[in-house]
Amino acid sequence: MLDNVLRIATRQSPLALWQAHYVKDKLMASHPGLVVELVPMVTRGDVILDTPLAKVGGKGLFVKELEVALLENRADIAVHSMKDVPVEFPQGLGLVTICEREDPRDAFVSNTYDSLDALPAGSIVGTSSLRRQCQLAERRPDLIIRSLRGNVGTRLSKLDNGEYDAIILAVAGLKRLGLESRIRAALPPEISLPAVGQGAVGIECRLDDARTRELLAALNHHETALRVTAERAMNTRLEGGCQVPIGSYAELIDGEIWLRALVGAPDGSQIIRGERRGAPQDAEQMGISLAEELLNNGAREILAEVYNGDAPA
């Protein structure tokens, strides 16, 4: 790598490219003279579009190819949507920077109805997420929930073509793509608890690359990192990938972390919820202890079914 060049591995979807350009612009603003190049690539999750993500299986569907590029020194950093980042990293790689979080809520998107509660019984709602599915089914068991894959533009096209009465997307993604006007309602965490890390952008690099880590330090957002640390610690203990019915959301209020989490049966028949409040320095331990509580209260059995019998210990 040339001293003044930094290469970013990124997926090629519009949202992934937005994230990569966001990081590129931040780096160039912080380090005048730095040349930042994008290295676009295709991941397994981008290719398999005809199967619900939960059935594709495997963790890291959207990041593995980017990590291989780092290990082979074809790129210096990989930029990820934090909700897609597995809890474990290949040896020698790690998450070193978490950028400031955008709105983490889920968005209700419809051309006909103003809110989730306004949908008539039997309406078809699209989502690819078991987490969204279980919360939707609990609140509105009279809806028909169908799988919805593809990038944001593809999903909106399917809604506009009449395949769905409404779809659920991330507020952050719509805002970043300039599509905020499509949001009919942002769903509060009480109705749809977000995914772990939702709305945050993370940066992965080789852990022994001191120069790159130094360049990235200016982009780290301390409050976001604390919140996402608590969320990810809980997910790690639950052995959760990005395609499981797990929600987790941490807020920093009056100097204290408030962490909420849930594990749900995909059909909404049972959702185990819990919460913790504590000091920011205890973020990781809070996540672990909340996960233990959920497991002991029934989450172990729910996850065993989702993981085909392979439950967290």
Curated annotation (Swiss-Prot):
Anything else known: The porphobilinogen subunits are added to the dipyrromethane group.
Catalytic activity: 4 porphobilinogen + H2O = hydroxymethylbilane + 4 NH4(+)
Cofactor binding: number and manner: Binds 1 dipyrromethane group covalently.
S-(dipyrrolylmethanemethyl)cysteine PTM positions: 242
Keywords of the record: Porphyrin biosynthesis, Transferase
InterPro entries on file: HemC, Porphobilin_deaminase_cofac_BS, Porphobilin_deaminase_N, Porphobilinogen_deaminase_C, Porphobilinogen_deaminase_C_sf
Known cofactor(s): dipyrromethane
Record flagged with keyword Transferase: yes
CDD domains: PBP2_EcHMBS_like
Family, similarity comment: Belongs to the HMBS family.
GO biological process: protoporphyrinogen IX biosynthetic process
GO CC entries: cytoplasm
Record-listed E.C. numbers: 2.5.1.61
Pathway, per record: Porphyrin-containing compound metabolism; protoporphyrin-IX biosynthesis; coproporphyrinogen-III from 5-aminolevulinate: step 2/4
Entry keyword Transferase: yes
Annotated protein name in UniProt: Porphobilinogen deaminase
Quaternary assembly: Monomer.
A molecular function (GO) term: hydroxymethylbilane synthase activity
Function: Tetrapolymerization of the monopyrrole PBG into the hydroxymethylbilane pre-uroporphyrinogen in several discrete steps.
Gene3D superfamilies per record: Periplasmic binding protein-like II, Porphobilinogen deaminase, C-terminal domain
Taxonomic source organism: Escherichia coli O6:H1 (strain CFT073 / ATCC 700928 / UPEC)
Taxonomic lineage of the native organism: Bacteria, Pseudomonadati, Pseudomonadota, Gammaproteobacteria, Enterobacterales
